[in-house]
Amino acid sequence: MSEGNDQDQGKGRLSLRPAGRKDVGRTVDAGSVRQSFSHGRSKVVQVEVRKKRGPGPAPAGSGSGSSGGGRAGGRGGSGGRALTASELATRQRVLEEQRAEAVRREQERREQEKIMILSAAEEARRRDEEARRAAEDEVREKEEAAARAREEEAERRASAQAHGQAGTPSRAEPEPESSGPVVSAVPIPGAVTLAPPMERLRPLAERAIMPARPVTPSRPATPAATPQAPGETLRLRTGRVGEAEDDRRPARRPGGGIAPGRKPSGASPKKGGDSRRSGRIDVQAAIEGDDDKTRSLASVRRQRERERRQAELERLRADQVRVVRDVILPETITVQELANRMAARQGEVIKALMKMGVMATVTQSLDADTAELVVQEFGHRVRRVADSDVEIGIEGIEDQPEDLLPRPPVVTVMGHVDHGKTSLLDALRTTDVAAAEAGGITQHIGAYQVTLPSGSKITFIDTPGHEAFTAMRARGASVTDVVVLVVAADDGVMPQTIEAIRHAKAANAPIIVAINKCDKPGANPERVRQELLSHEIVVESMGGDTQDVEVSALKRTGLDKLEEAILLQAEMLDLRANPDRVAEGSVIESRLDRGRGPVATVLVQKGTLRRGDIVVAGAEWGRVRAMLDDRGRQIQEAAPAMPVEILGIAGVPGAGEPFVVVDNENRAREISEFRQRVIRDRTAAGQTAARGTLDQMLARIQAGAQKEVAVLIKADVQGSAEALQATVLKLEHEEVKVRVLTAGVGQITESDVQLAKASDAVIIAFNVRATTQARELAQREGVDIRYYSIIYQVADDVEQLVKGKVAPKHREKFLGYAEIRKVFDITKVGKVAGCYVTEGVVKRGCGVRLLRDNVVVHEGELSQLKRFKDDVKEVARGYECGLSFAGYNDLREGDMVECYEMELVPA
C-alpha cells in the first residue's frame, strides 16, 4: 500500500527533460505558397507545418547523479530515502523506451530530409522551365510592341503629310519616354524592392517547410550602382504611409481592384504581416501593368488566329472584282424584283431598307426614289425609266431580206351600203353570209381566207358600208394590201364610196374597182367609170393604172377575172413575211361570247401565232387557249396573213388594236396595266373637260340652258359598240348634250342597270339581252332598256330624245319567253317548233325574236300558235305549245323565243 502511494506521488517527478530546462522553441512553422492557374491567374495559400513536442536525449550521468545525490541525500540527510528495486527497474525501462523513441525519430527526420532534397530538385527543374517560358513571352511581347510602335509612327506620319506637316514632328505630342511618370531608381522611403521574379519563385516544398522570409527595405543605392528600369521596381506599401497622396488612395486588392472597406482590426500585427502583404501593389504599378499576371499562350494564340483570318478576309475582299450593274428602275417596283435586278439577296435589300427607316417585305412595292437610294447603297448604276418605256422593243427586230417568204395578200372589200360587198364575198367563198345579216346590211368585220383552184390563197376582210362604221373601214384599210372597191352599176358612186376611196389612199393601198350588179336592168358600168374620174380613180380602160372588173355576185359571173386581178396586183407588190419569229398583227373584231369568254378575231401580219403563246392585245393580255379558223375548225398555228379567232384573253380588246406575242407573263401584265392606266386617265380627263369648271356648271344649271341625255350602250361586238357610240355623239344639239356613260360588249347585267339608274340614263342594247335579274331590277327601278338590231333605229330614237321627243309613239312591251324543245318538219307548212313557255305569255300575232346564246338571230312575227291541234290566242307560263314563224325555218333545239308587242304610248 505504501509502495503504491509512493508511486502515485512520484508520478509528478518523472520527466524526460532535465530539471530546470524549459522548451521555448516553436512547434508550428508557417509560410505562404503562390499557386499558378491558367490564363495568368494565381493565388497565395498559407501553409503550416506542425512539429511534435519531444525531449532531447538525457545528458550522461544525469540519472546516476540524481540517484547518487538522492542516495547521498538519503544517506546524509535526515529525511532521504533510498530507491527500491522496483522503482529503479521502472526508471530503467522508461529510459530505454526514450532512447528507442529518439532513434526512431532520428530515422524519420533523415527520411524527411531525403524527400525534401528530391522535392527541391523537382521544383528547380520546374522553375527553370517557367523561366524559359517567361523569357520567350517577354521577347515576343517586345517584338509586338515594336511592331505596334512602327505602325503608329507610320500612321502619324501619314496624317501629318495629309495636313501638310510631313517631316516636322508635332511639338504638342509628348515624347515616348515621357508618356508616363518617371520612376527614379533611388529607393523611396516606406517602399521596398521585391526580389527578382526568379527569387520569388521558391520551391513549393521549401516554402511549405521553412517559414516565409520577410521582405526587408532595400538599402539606399546610387543610380549608377543599381540601374533599374522603371518597370522593374514596384513600390510596396509597408505599414502606414503618411503622404497625403497615399491617404487619398483607396485600398487595392492584389490584382489591382478596389477592395471593400473593412473595419480596423484590434489585434496586433503578427510577425509575418509584411510577407502576407507582399503581393499588393500601388496605383502606379497597377497603371503600368507591372504585375506578375500575363495572358496565357492559348489566349494569345486565339487572338493571332483571329487577326490572321481577318487579314485574309480583307485581302480576299480587296482582290475580289466588284460587279457594277445598270439597274433599270420603273415608277414602282417590288423588293423582290429589285433584289433580282441587282443580283443581291432579298434579306440584304430588306436590311438596307431598315437602315433607311423603311419596314418592307419582299412583296411590297417601292417608289422609284426609294429604290434608287437602295441601288446606290449597293454601288450599282441607276437608270430611271418612264411607265411608257415598258413598250420599248415590243415590236421586235427588223427582218432580214433572206428570211422573208411569200405570203397571201390581204384584200379588204369596201363600198357603199347595199352595193353587194358581202354577196360578192359569199360568191367567192361559196357560202351564204348575207342572208344572216340583220336588215341585209353588214354590221361586223368578217375575215375569211379563200383557197383558189390554183392553190393560191387570198385573205378577205369584209367591212360595213354604213355611215356609222367609219372606224371599221379605217381599221380594214390599215391592215390591207389591196382594196376592192365595190360600186353598184345602177347606183354609181355614193357617199360611203367616196369615204372608202379616202381610206384606201390614206393607207397607200392599191385599188381594184369591182362594178357589181351588172346583170340588173339599167346597169351602166361606163357611168361608174366616169364618176370615178372625179375622185382621181382612172381605170385601165381609160388609160389609167387602176384595174376594173365587171362582176355579178348574184349570177356569179366575172369572179375568175376578179381573182386574177387580185393575184396580179399581189405579185406586183411582192408581199413577203418572216414566219420564223414572234407573231404580230391586228385585232379585226372582238366580242364577249357566253361559254367561251372574250373572243378576238385577229389577223397575223408577221411571224407565226401558236397555241400557248402569251399575247398582248391592246390593253388586254392572255395565253392563247384555242385558235379557230374562219370555218370554226381548231388549228394549232396561224401563218402570216391568216385570220383566226383566239380564246384565252382576259378581257375584250379594242377593235383595231395591235397584238403582239411577248416572252413571259410579267412583261405582258406590265404592258397591259400601263395601257389600262392610260385609258383611265384619258377618260377621266375627258369627263373633267366636258364638265368644265364648277362655276360654269352652276351657271348652266341656274340658267337651265343645257340639258343632257345619258345613254349606256351594250353591243354584241366591240366594233358595233364603237359605231353606236360615234353615231350617238353625232346627234348632239347645242341645247342638249349626249353623254355616253359606257360602251361595252356582252349582256346587260345588274351593275349596268344600277349605273343607268344613278345617272338617269337609257340603256341601248344592240343584239344582246338583259339577264333575268337585270330585267327585274330595271322594272323595279324604272330604268328604260331598249333593244335594237339595226343601227338606223338607234339613230332615230336617240335623235328623237335629243329633239325633245322623250318617248316614241310606239313602245315595245315584253310578253314572255318560250324554249324550243323539239323541231318538226310539216309538209306545206315548214318547220314548227314545239315550245315550253318559261316566263310570261305567248300571244298569237305578237312580234318574236329568236335568241341563240343570247344573240338575236331572227326577228319577225308569230304566224301560228297552237296547243295540241287547236289554234289558241295565247299560252301562259308552264304550258306547251307549237309555234311557227313567218318566212323563217332555221330553228334549233335549245333556242329561246322572246315574245313582245308594240303599244302606243301618248307623248
Curated annotation (Swiss-Prot):
NCBIfam families (alphabetical): IF-2, small_GTP
GO CC entries: cytosol
Subcellular location: Cytoplasm
Keywords tagged on the record: Cytoplasm, GTP-binding, Initiation factor, Nucleotide-binding, Protein biosynthesis
Region (G5): 552-554
A GO molecular function held by the record: GTPase activity
Region annotation (G4) ranges: 516-519
Chain intervals for the UniProt region annotation (G3): 462-465
SUPFAM superfamilies cross-referenced by the UniProt entry: Initiation factor IF2/eIF5b, domain 3 (SSF52156), P-loop containing nucleoside triphosphate hydrolases (SSF52540), Translation proteins (SSF50447)
Main location: cytoplasm
Residue ranges annotated for the tr-type G domain, each copy included: 406-576
Biased composition (Basic and acidic residues): 93-114, 122-158, 240-249, 271-280
Record-given protein name: Translation initiation factor IF-2
Organism of provenance: Gluconacetobacter diazotrophicus (strain ATCC 49037 / DSM 5601 / CCUG 37298 / CIP 103539 / LMG 7603 / PAl5)
